[in-house]
Amino acid sequence: MSKKLTRYIAIYGIGVYLLALLVISIAFRDHALQLRWMLWGIGEVLFFFVLTTIFYPRWKNDDPKSFWRKVFWVALAIRLLYVLFSYFYFEHNMGFHFDSPGDGVGYYNRSVRLSRYIRRGDFGYVIDFIRNYSFGYSDHGYLIWLTFLHTLFGRGVLVARLFKALMSAYLCIVVYKLASRTFGERTGRLAAVMCVFMPILIQLTGMHVKEMEMIFLSILALERMDFLIRSKKYTFWNIVFPILLVGLSFGFRTVIGMCLIFAFLVFVILSPSNLVNRKGKIITLSITVAVFLVFLFTAIGSEMKIIYRINFSGTDYMAKRYESIGLKYGELSKSKYLFPGAFVLPLSPMIEEAPVHNKLIHGSTYIKNFLAFFAMLAIVIAIRQKRWRDFSLIGAYELSYLAIIMFTFTSNSERFHEPAIPLILVMAAYAMTHLRRKDLVLFYVYCGLLCIALFAWNWLKLAARGLV
């Protein structure tokens, strides 16, 4: 992608955000965002588009080792600075070291409590607590991880966040490897640079929730699966490591593990014969099915059945919930209406009535809304270029995860969409590096529709509460 085109897309990205924010703030001036949230959002949008535009042209022609070093160390420096900044910012503005009194505080309190019992040698209490006072296997992973850190390093919150910063920085390298092998060097480098400056992947390092670890495990698992098949190096470690990562992923969110297994099956089936011959496909599929059955007859399997039984039968859950608390237009939250916007939703909240966490990341949410066009276009380009087989691992994972999220009661939650963001960056980078002039017409139309959709989304939030 040329430097001129990079700037062109960045200008549109910034312009659409500022226009939408201005129109919404004027139209709903009694409910406009406070100045601090506006500045947060503007800062997030400018940070991503301006720095991506500056650094991608500078780094795109470096030799691979030099590129890796720059990506990792710049990403790590940014994330370490944000961890320290957010620590004091939350303390000053929220009264404690968390962005909101939600899940992060709960995970912290439980893990600190368990670490005290471990130091006393009371392992029986710890096992009993994890078994009886957590929400199933998918709630165990993060709690055990935090408990381990607090046992070694004490009750401070910074150590866990420093590890998040390290994971987030290395994630940029993992994204580069996966994107480069799938779509080529240009795409891999652009995806890595966007990953370095993607605000939400930075902001998650300053939050005490499990999304950063979950994202890291899932993308690393995909990269190792991709390496296993493309390298044809079927060593013990190359086979066991992806299985281990999938197992760990189940400990953070059940659907992540399910989608990883599904994506690998699709990738193997659709791989051309020069990658996996017929005999290799039979062996690989047999091993994958065997691993799946092992998972199925454990606590993981019980949760998979619960996911299927409750989530997919409860696609109208949010509509009923909104109606029960007196909100209007709950009908529109049904999955059949939301599913077509799986890549785009949820849209950025630009009104004061949104939760604090959502206002804090509303600029990041907008960037995802904007890049969703290129992610969707990537599917068209892959088919157009007859590269859909190369795209099968990434596509199967992303589409299956988004489909599950959109057909459950989590379809409106930003947090549940965050694991999809790294692959949206990969897909967007692929589309941007293979744009045709004709594609820009669709891009202009999308920018206009996005402005209208942002206005309608925020109006709907106010109208549902009877405020407009």
Label each PLM-derived region with a short phrase:
Residues 176, 181, 231-237, 277-279, ...:
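Membrane-interface helix-loop-helix junctions at transmembrane boundaries of multi-pass membrane enzymes
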Residues 206-214:
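Short acidic/glycine- and proline-prone juxtamembrane loop motifs at membrane-interface regions
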Residues 14-20, 76-79, 241-244, 386-406:
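Transmembrane alpha-helix segments characteristic
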Residues 158, 175-197, 392:
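Transmembrane-helix signature of polytopic, membrane-embedded enzymes
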Residues 202-203, 237-260:
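Membrane-interface alpha helices of multi-pass inner-membrane proteins
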Residues 52-54, 341, 345-388:
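Hydrophobic, aromatic-rich transmembrane alpha-helices
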Residues 55-57, 162-182, 374-378:
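Transmembrane-helix motifs of polytopic, lipid-linked glycan transferases
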Residues 63-70, 233-240, 272-289, 436-448:
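Membrane-interfacial entry segments at the cytosolic side of transmembrane helices
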